[in-house]
Design a protein with these regions (language model features):
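Transmembrane helical cores of multi-pass secondary ion antiporters/exchangers
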Residues: 1-379
Length: 379
């Protein structure tokens, strides 16, 4: 990003490069399934199942609340004559789409960050699980709103929206469970020494799940996450065998860890390349609006986390500063960028504004929140 600003030649090369491929398509259909699967097989699945209702409530309420809180606030900002954005013609649904794409956190960045902090395993699992599932829920909410945008709100009924939402969520979970169960049974009959076969099987499953999901309009994100939980490194494939054996050999999990790190590095390079051309449409007048939106996003995230934790703390124990860690540790990344790029051109000039706001929030969460979280936790 900095090189692109300093060197106009690099800016030209980056612009040309990003126009040669569809970043949104590459991330959502190729990179994201691999990254989510890698995260799902490494999380502590036993503690995740014990805290499933806590994680699901945090993920679902947080995303839905943030979507409407951020979307409503941004719509109000665009309607104020003071900011001069009313001519862009952003509708309430357009602003809700921004709220939906910026609500889910980046599980890859969150998982990497959580592992570096000395948190209890329960808190670590809650944070990792919430981040994994809010991605799936966020994509479903975004696609539901996108369907309303494309078909026209007058042609949409509450029943059709509910059916679309249920089909995405339930279908994705069932598909992931079926493929995960079959995959577990398959690797169970393969000796863990045959690493190459287990790697090929897992790669095939991750490639196949999104293809089937898109065919039946299921959530590919949820399917891959659920499938990964079935092949988790903490799952015992056969408790009657000598000792407790993992579903797959250690080298398979090491392979996925390496792939996770590699794809994550590539992802952030691609995000940087995508940001550079967008900055050409940046105007100084956006600075105040960006600051306001960042504050709105962080506060909405905080409320969306604090309320469920307050309710759940009646029966569940939470480590001190859990709400603060989940709020400030809610880094945004490639998914938000990909969804923003996937917005229809019918939004008009407002799409450039949404892209700039999205990149600004992503950069703030990574550079400011990501680098200061440890200090905040220790304070």
């Amino acid at each position: 990003l900095i090189v692109g600003i300093i060197s106009p030649e690099f800016l030209s090369i980056a612009t040309s490069l990003t126009q040669q491929f569809d970043f949104s398509e590459l991330l959502i259909n190729v990179m994201l399934p691999f990254l989510l699967f890698a995260g799902a097989i490494s999380v502590n699945v036993h503690e995740l199942l014990n805290d499933k209702w806590v994680i699901l409530l945090l993920a679902s309420f947080g995303v839905i609340f943030s979507t409407f809180a951020v979307g409503t606030a941004v719509f109000w900002i665009t309607q104020q004559p003071l900011f001069g954005l009313s001519e862009m013609g952003l509708t309430y649904v357009d602003c809700l789409l921004f709220g939906a794409l910026i609500a889910p956190t980046d599980p890859i960045a969150v998982l990497a960050m959580v592992k570096k902090m000395n948190l209890s395993s329960v808190t670590e699992t809650r944070i990792a699980g919430e981040s994994l599932f809010n991605d799936g829920i966020g994509v479903v909410v975004f696609l539901t709103l996108l369907s309303i945008k494309m078909e026209g709100i007058e042609n949409i009924t509450p029943q059709s929206v509910s059916l679309l939402f249920i089909n995405e969520v339930v279908g994705g979970v069932i598909l992931g469970a079926v493929m995960g169960f079959l995959g577990l049974k398959l690797v169970k009959y393969i000796e863990n020494e045959h690493v190459e076969l287990e790697v090929i099987i897992t790669l095939s499953l991750v490639l196949l799940a999104p293809l089937i999901s898109h065919q039946f309009h299921f959530s590919a994100v949820l399917a891959v996450v659920v499938m990964g939980l079935f092949l988790n490194q903490n799952i015992d494939s056969d408790k009657k065998a000598e000792g407790l054996q993992k579903a797959m050999g250690d080298y398979v999990y090491k392979f996925w860890h390496l792939l996770d790190e590699t794809l994550n590095a590539i992802l952030f390079i691609l995000i940087g390349l995508e940001i550079i051309p967008i900055l050409q449409n940046f105007a100084l007048g956006y600075v105040f609006i960006i600051i306001m939106v960042i504050i709105i996003v962080v506060v909405s995230r905080g409320i969306g986390v604090f309320l469920p934790i307050t309710l759940l703390s009646i029966k569940k124990q939470f480590e001190e500063k859990t709400a603060l860690i989940i709020t400030w540790g809610g880094l945004r990344g490639g998914l938000s960028v990909a969804l923003a790029l996937n917005l229809p051109d019918s939004i008009g000039e407002g799409k450039d504004l949404i892209l700039i706001l999205t990149y600004s929030v992503v950069l703030f969460t990574i550079l400011v929140q990501g680098l200061t979280l440890k200090k905040i936790v220790k304070s």
